[in-house]
Amino acid sequence: MNSLNSFLSEAQKNRHAIGHFNFVTADVLRAIAEGAKEAGAPAVMVGTSEGEAEFLGMTEAVALVKAMREELQFPVFLNADHFKSFEKCRQAIDAGYDTVLIDGSKLGYEENIVLVKQVKDYAGDKVAVEGELGYLRGSSEVQRKVEISSA
């Protein structure tokens, strides 16, 4: 199977997206993967937040995704979604996640850069690493804490 980076490069070249959906149960994972395959998507990314990873277990999430990938013969990639610490990212990398999003958005810019570099150095070339600077509006947590104008 091709790497996540090859699918993302192809998606960018062809101006389409690779969907990303979080899951916390095997049933939800199956629905996501089967739906993406039936819709003709080239691949799909599934993720666990820190809370979902704690509930499900990181090694269990990796095993579920690997089994789904093999059963469906369809590229399903697992993302550690908005993990807040190096330690949690390290655990996800060691467990076998395909990609991690280290969310240092509550840190200052320089501290955030240091954190992202620390995770990338640990991950090497085996796991894709994404960093977040600032915050993205739209998360339910952000909507509860930040007043959003309807204008």
What feature does the model see in each segment?
Residues 1-19, 66:
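N-terminal amphipathic alpha-helix/helix-capping segment at the start of soluble metabolic enzymes
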Residues 20-37:
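N-terminal glycine-rich phosphate/pyrophosphate-binding loops that anchor nucleotide-derived ligands
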Residues 24-26, 47-51, 81-85, 105-107, ...:
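Active-site beta-loop-alpha junctions enriched in small/polar residues
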Residues 27-30, 54-62, 82-91, 104-128:
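Active-site-adjacent beta->alpha loops and helix N-cap segments on the catalytic face
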Residues 38-93:
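Active-site cofactor/substrate anionic-group-binding motifs, chiefly glycine-
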Residues 40-41, 94-100, 125:
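Glycine-enriched alpha-helix->loop->beta-strand junction motifs that scaffold or abut catalytic
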Residues 46, 51-56, 98-115, 141-151:
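Glycine-rich tight-turn/loop motif centered on a GG-T
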